Amino acid sequence: MDESRVVLKYNEGIPAMNKETEVEIIKKFIVKNKQERIIWKLQNAKKRKKVFWHFDHPDILKKEILYPSTYKDAEHLEKVLYEMSGTRECYVIGECYIGTMQLRQACEEAWQGGICIIYCGNGIGYYQGDQEKGAPPRFMLLKEKCCKIPSRI
């Protein structure tokens, strides 16, 4: 297994997870009336593997933290997230993985499609929703004024 990423393999149960980081992500980005249920599902072995479906549409996210993002290839997305956060490691909640991952790998996974939240810490993240028609919804997630927002994100 590539040591640059920790991958949740659903048939192996719950790997070592970072409960504090998961709660932080949910509290910072998810609307209040959905937080408790999602946190419970993340901590439940049987429910954890399907929790990502809560993130299929951006209406579950707090509106004040959403900054629409244009299409970016993996390299550009990594550059933008690194410039804002200064970190090469992130926490990912996605369709096939939940856990710590190198930023480059997380951006490549997002670029391939699929629902995901990439969290770089300090209230900085990226969201990609489910693709129904056209491009999937994509947003930079910025809690408060945690960093300088690039002119084009």
What positions do the PLM features span?
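Structured alpha/beta or helical-core interaction and ligand-binding surfaces enriched in interleaved
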Residues: 1-134, 139-153
